[in-house]
């Protein structure tokens, strides 16, 4: 009978010592991994706190909102239309396209551009509609713009090519404005003054032209008839000026004597 071989104790001791040697290394690696996770969590928490702080602070909101280019339209109307409130509106909620669309819907504004500078400073530059007429009597001075907008305003020296409107109430001025915007600029520039002539003809108008002629016509026929004015005067006797009445037909009566 064979004798039982003794266990190889030295080899087992070496294995145990090897595992004991590796345990500190494994522990160190686990500790480093846990530290990295903790750092990532702390960074994430810090970022979240920073975002919350930023959103709650004034740094995330519109710092200034300036409007340039206004002449007749009030800046307050433009700012209100933009829906931007300084120190209240968050900058990331500001859509340039939407803001400009709302501003260009303001009566009297033809177009607008917007630029943004550092730290949420905004500036909007507007181009107003051209002034095409000026009403100088009661209930107060008013300016008529090319889009038909009627706004309070004082006489301006630069209105050289715009007619003066006299004797119009708010209602009659609105009716005239709807027709006035349909007049070609080259014809409109020939009108010196338009007077409400309601005393003789309801809705009637008396126009004093820059060439010396006077035109009588109704508001309803204003735009259609007056756009033919150049053709009408070309058919008049050369060198003659007078009163042109447009009422179904066209009638010319020269002034008596020299005007």
From Swiss-Prot:
Instruction: From the record, give the transmembrane residue ranges.
Output: 39-59
Residues on the Cytoplasmic side?
1-38
What keywords does the record list, in alphabetical order?
A: Cell cycle, Cell division, Cell membrane, Membrane, Transmembrane, Transmembrane helix
Instruction: Check the record and name the Pfam families matching this protein.
Output: FtsQ_DivIB_C, POTRA_1
Q: Which residues form the POTRA domain?
A: 60-129
Localization terms from the record: Cell membrane
Which loops or segments lie on the Extracellular side of the membrane, by the record?
60-259
Q: How does it sit in the membrane?
A: Single-pass type II membrane protein
From what superkingdom does this record's organism come?
Bacteria
InterPro entries per record: Cell_div_FtsQ/DivIB_C (IPR005548), DivIB (IPR026580), FtsQ_DivIB (IPR050487), POTRA (IPR034746), POTRA_FtsQ_type (IPR013685)
Q: Which GO terms describe its cellular component?
A: cell division site; plasma membrane
What GO biological process terms does the UniProt entry carry, in alphabetical order? FtsZ-dependent cytokinesis
Q: Which HAMAP family match?
A: DivIB
What role does this protein play?
Answer: Cell division protein that may be involved in stabilizing or promoting the assembly of the division complex.
Query: PANTHER family, alphabetically?
Result: CELL DIVISION PROTEIN DIVIB, CELL DIVISION PROTEIN FTSQ
Q: What family is reported?
A: Belongs to the FtsQ/DivIB family. DivIB subfamily.
Name listed for the protein in its UniProt record: Cell division protein DivIB
From which organism does this entry originate?
Answer: Exiguobacterium sibiricum (strain DSM 17290 / CCUG 55495 / CIP 109462 / JCM 13490 / 255-15)
Taxonomic classification:
Bacteria, Bacillati, Bacillota, Bacilli, Bacillales
**Gene encoding it?**
divIB
